[in-house]
Structures are given as structure tokens and as C-alpha cells.
Amino acid sequence: MFPPVQDLYRIAPEIVLCLFGMLIMLIDPFIPAGRQRAMGWLAFVGTLGAFASLRWMFMNPGSAYSGLLRADTFSLFVHGIVIAVAALAILGSFDYLDHEGIQRGEYYALILFATAGMGILAGANELVTAFVGLEISSISTYILAGFRRNALKSN
């Protein structure tokens, strides 16, 4: 049985972020090494899509999934901040990744997954949901912290 459409509207930003993250991971192996910056632009478009989907969340306030998540003005505000910061982080990392020679698509996918986890954490109405959001964002952040394998600071 599928959840009601209102529940899907209330988690629309997370759905958009995860779909773009999976799309980047599926497309990335087929992109030539010199064109990896396109994955960053695709991730940026994903953050714009998630930001645009906040409208659906705003139009359908209330709880979702039997009270596990809550879509209200506070979670909408936090979602907006988190998605905007992720978009700025993606834009700011283009030249850095080129300079370090580690321009790979999974970097951008991990940023999108971490952003989705923070969004779940922002809308959590139960402790279990908060833990799931925290784990999704923290695992992605741990992987991002060790992304530069050859640097001593990442080890």
C-alpha cells in the first residue's frame, strides 16, 4: 500500500535530493574524466529542485507517516537553510576539487545524501526518526571527511 500523496509532499525535498544523488551515482562512471564538473552542476540543479519542492511542503503542513515526520514552519525554515548551504558548498567546491585533482561525482552525491539526512533530522517528530536522519547525514559526512585519501588530514 502506498502512502498518501500528502505524505510524499511533506518529504518532497528529501525525495528530490536522494533521486539526484542516485542519478549522479548512476551516471558518474560513464562520464569522461575531464567532464566530471557536469556532475557538480547536476547536483546544483538537484538542490534547486529540492528548494523548489519546499513549496509542496509549505502547501501541505502537518505530520507524515503516522507522526514520524512533521512539516511545519520551523522544519520548512531549516530545510531552506540546509539546502541553500548545500548549494553554496557545491558551487564552492568546483575549483577546490579541480585544484586537488579529486573531481569525482560521488562527492556531490554524498553532499546531497547528507543534506537529505539533515532534512529528515529537521522534520523529525520521533526520536527514531531523528536518529535515522542523524545517521544518514553523519555517515555521508564521515565519508566526505576522508575523501582525500592521500592527505594526512583526511586519515
Summary of predicted features, one role per range:
Residues 1-155:
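Alpha-helical transmembrane segments of multi-pass membrane proteins predominantly involved
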